[in-house]
Swiss-Prot record:
The active site is at residue 64. This is Orotidine 5'-phosphate decarboxylase. GO terms for molecular function: orotidine-5'-phosphate decarboxylase activity. HAMAP family: OMPdecase_type1_B. Pathway: Pyrimidine metabolism; UMP biosynthesis via de novo pathway; UMP from orotate: step 2/2. Its EC number is 4.1.1.23. It comes from Pseudomonas savastanoi pv. phaseolicola (strain 1448A / Race 6) (Pseudomonas syringae pv. phaseolicola (strain 1448A / Race 6)). Homodimer. It comes from the Bacteria. It catalyses: orotidine 5'-phosphate + H(+) = UMP + CO2. The gene is pyrF.
Length: 232
């Protein structure tokens, strides 16, 4: 059974181990999980995952793997062997890539991480998609990629809260992980398609990724507690 009792995932978006652990030491693993992204992982490698797990945290390894099927599957396998709770891949890598990742996890013994697909990044709007040759609404592309992810056997999707309701209706078995969550009154920063924590859960999100409103708060523990209270 998970030690964490809430849907909150705090993003440890820091350049150094020291900064990340300084924040982690102010957080309660019963109230949140933590996300390790590219900057921190490249700076610290697998050691940061082990250290966070030893502190009681379940770790979402947010590296968004996207490569040929075998290479991506081996990366997912390596993440699983580190003991991460969740790992993600880009759905735009295609059905064969995602299926290879699912299969490599099923061949392992022991606990399996949640395998999550990334649809359309929350910073992207229609004009951004048009710039890469997709002249469609982001939600249309999200639904296309979601169908591929479900067919490949993924456990869930990373998506904007504004896509959550449609995704939950179309794919009720998939767990939805939503970045771009901003408590009421927070700055939007570079996340465009955002909702508050309560709005995101009501829309169908299962896990909420929150970064700067907690990590940059004067009192991160208090900020986390306020989010948890909003969700109660």
């Amino acid at each position: 059974m998970s030690a964490c009792q809430t849907p909150v995932i705090v993003a440890l978006d820091f350049p150094t181990r020291e900064a990340a652990l300084r924040l982690a030491d102010q957080l309660d693993p019963k109230l949140c999980r933590v996300k390790v992204g590219k900057e921190l992982f490249i700076s610290c490698a697998a050691d940061i995952v082990e250290t966070l797990r030893n502190k009681g945290f379940e770790v979402f390894l947010d590296l968004k793997f996207h490569d040929i099927p075998n290479t991506t599957a081996m990366a997912v396998k390596a993440a699983a062997e580190m003991g991460v709770w969740m790992v993600n891949v880009h759905c735009s890598g295609g059905l064969r890539m995602m299926t290879a990742c699912r299969e490599v996890l099923e061949q392992r013994s022991g606990p399996q991480p949640l395998l999550i697909g990334v649809t359309v990044l929350t910073s992207m709007e229609r004009e951004d998609l048009a710039g890469i040759g997709l002249d469609i609404d982001p939600q249309v592309q999200v639904l296309r990629l979601a169908a591929l992810a479900e067919k490949a056997g993924l456990d869930g999707l990373v998506c904007s809260a504004l896509e959550a309701q449609a995704l939950k209706a179309a794919h009720p078995s998939l767990q939805l992980v939503t970045p771009g969550i901003r408590p009421a009154g927070s700055a939007q920063d570079d996340q465009r398609r955002i909702l508050t924590p309560r709005q995101a859960l009501d829309a169908g999100s299962d896990h909420l990724v929150i970064g700067r409103p907690i990590s940059q708060a004067a009192d991160p523990a208090k900020a986390l507690a306020a989010v948890v209270a909003e969700l109660a």
